[in-house]
Regions:
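Short hydrophobic beta-strand that contains or immediately precedes a catalytic carboxylate
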Residues: 51, 61-66
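Rhodanese-like catalytic fold shared by cysteine-dependent sulfurtransferases
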Residues: 16-49, 54-57, 72-128, 132-179
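Bacterial N-terminal signal peptides
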Residues: 4-14
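Glycine-rich nucleotide phosphate-binding loop and flanking beta-alpha elements
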Residues: 69
């Protein structure tokens, strides 16, 4: 009896870890680096090989939403601040800070403008969102884009680090500058 109880106790954590993450009704807040759902209602979830195929075909706009690291508020005034470099999937539009649970009006306008730029203003043009593996930011941005009326939305949960980990090339990214 004791052995059975110990065996059950050892197996339960694995069962808990294997449970699927539910999609929230709204947007997900912090912590953003956490297990993500299997998919996003209304979007097409793609994994590494499918994302690579879409990238090679060149018909889908790739959008990275990894946030920029903020300048520390307590940094002395005469200190030079250098942002950490960010590598991403080649040809990607980097729209940082657009995957948070709540966006400021400026961040919302930046996302809308970036989407118009990469889709030519066509809400039927396919657009793929990513960040890092197990990052809710790309899920939030894809969900928000669906709410804006875009109809061909892809979500790539493995993100840029999954891409790089598979040996696919990356390149330095700069945030998209809108006119």
């Amino acid at each position: 009896m004791l052995r059975a109880a110990l065996l059950l106790a050892c197996l339960l954590p694995g069962v808990a870890l294997a449970q699927a993450v539910a999609e929230p009704e709204g947007y997900r807040g912090a912590p953003y680096a956490a297990p993500v759902p299997e998919g996003l209602a209304g979007a097409t979830t793609v994994h590494l090989e499918e994302a690579r195929r879409l990238w090679e075909e060149g018909e889908v706009a790739f959008v990275d939403v990894l946030p920029r690291e903020p300048k520390p508020a307590d940094l002395p005034e005469d200190t030079i601040w250098r942002e950490r470099p960010h590598d991403s999937i080649p040809g990607t539009a980097w729209l940082p800070n657009t995957g948070y649970e709540a966006l400021s009006p400026e961040e919302e306008a930046y996302l809308e403008g970036g989407l118009r730029a990469v889709t030519g203003g066509d809400p039927t043009r396919p657009v793929l969102f990513f960040c890092k593996t197990d990052c809710w930011m790309s899920w939030n941005a894809a969900k928000r884009t669906l709410g804006m009326g875009y109809r061909n939305v892809f979500w790539f949960p493995e993100g840029a680090d999954g891409w790089a980990g598979a040996g696919y090339g990356t390149e330095p990214a700069e945030p998209m500058v809108l006119p």
